[in-house]
């Protein structure tokens, strides 16, 4: 049947195998109003069980995970956050921060091994994403620690000085964002075969999580250098711990993943026409990431308070994660519309049904390029018996010899 959105002939099903749009069912059928349209907001491309507007961290930052693994990752994240929060409520903030600092990186390493997408070159991918981000994050935090303490000490009597606010809320976040891009951009230039929008998102998220983890450990060490237990109410420790161990890594991951996805989409071979959607435009991604990095730090310095600071970081992290989710969704739709199909069938890891090996599952609409390497099982089409070659041909039959007068050989 012909897709009304991209105009290509697509196998019958609920979704177009090329552009992922919802197809009308039956002769003269119509698509439900909320399911129509090229944007396909009712079904997120990497996990059609969720809406595009679902606030889901796992399916946004770890798009290759199959459904069962994604559910397990959500439980691990929830339990880890609760454990870190429980430790923080006991006023052991450094321990809670270290526990929270390793939570998302552990999830990433599990994800990296489970999806097996980069099993050909795991060392270089890990080294230039997570490890490079961690080293640069630790270096930046240690390098600026004494400078910030000195600037802060000069203005204790009348609130933060202008120089401290500029350094802490503008220079440091923007410099950190640039450092988070170093590793992924190195991969971009030295490994051009990683040319998929999913590669860009995963590399950016990995670098950001490594950066945030190292930054959190340095912050915890700075607290350990003083008393381990400090005074104050419960929220004096709980909210800062959640901000440092959860919201800040998510903010970094959303910002860096958004930028890297836009960069990788520009050279994706499956997207011949450059996307015109704002969410996938590189200038917009850079501007959104810069605002998301600076705004919460600036508001925290200008309007202090632990609860207010938590709210600023929560809003910034949620906004950047949503933009990264929209950018990935639209990017997968854009590249799918240019994809070419082959004759094999695959088993979709989401709905477990056979579907043509195109850009999207014809049954549930999942972007098959977002499937783990082990998740999509290809089923070869029935093979026709090969033509008999010389080795397989039956032995030739000798022509009958002519007989003599008495039936003997001449």
Predicted regions and their residues:
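Hydrophobic alpha-helical segments at protein termini of multi-pass membrane proteins
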Residues: 1-410
